[in-house]
Amino acid sequence: MKKILIVEGNLKEENQDFIDAGIPTHTESLKESISYFTNNLDIDVANPSSDQDISEKVKDLNKYDGLIWGGSSLNIYNDTIEIRRQLDFMKECQKKIKKILAICWGMQVAVTAAGGLVKKCDKGSHRGIAYNIEINQYGANHQIYKDKQKKFNTPAFNFDEVVTVPESATILSSNQINNIQGLNFKINSSNVWGIQYHPEIPYEKMIRLIHFRKERLLEKKAFKSGDEIVTHVKSIEDEISNSNKELRMKELYNWINYLNEN
């Protein structure tokens, strides 16, 4: 049985707010999505920002066959102690874990730890959904997009984006808002598959997150008004009826297959 580590990107306070609101944490969503494909993985969870024993966990990273690093509401350029702890932990993971799937915030942490750059999006944001992600010629030949449609919509929630990739990185997909939606790079002993969007999170949770973060989103001017939120949520609800669960999660499925090779 393969052993993997899931890294929780949100602070424990944010996760407690999720729990109080009856919303699954990102780690819980990821575990549920993994279980759709397999129950034959031994899974540990770490939160570098909050775990007091994180230095002890660093010593044991060699025991993992793979790592999945999930989403967060943090902004990496804010350079807080909690964010620095995550970057330090990612650097250690990139030395010791061969197969890494970095999702949304996870991709931003992986890229930054490897010398790339993340900034606030210039062309807008994704608020529960990303439209028209296109797989390029490199992505079409990459295992992460095996059997994935060449243009697709997907759950997503991000206001920041990768603008400079690590040395030797290959961009795999993009859309009109983010030039880098998918990438692949190798560093030290790690092969990092990165995606800016969330195949592991259902649209229904994205809608709940929009309502949960309503005041924050209005303050950030992500939406002009409550009426715009209603209209936007309706468009996501329409997408639910058009989407296919297995196709939506194809990247996760393909990474699990990659994990189980050798």
Regions found by a protein language model. Give the residues of each.
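Short, glycine/charged-enriched secondary-structure capping and boundary segments
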Residues: I19-G22, I81-R84, A114-V118, A169-T170, ...
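Cysteine-nucleophile active-site neighborhood
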Residues: S72-Y138
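Pocket-forming structural segment of enzyme catalytic cores
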Residues: G9-L11, G116-N188, V192-E204
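C-terminal and late-domain segments of enzyme folds
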Residues: T170-N262
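N-terminal beta1-alpha1 cap of cysteine-dependent amidohydrolase-like domains
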Residues: M1-D88, E92-K96, K220, K224-N262
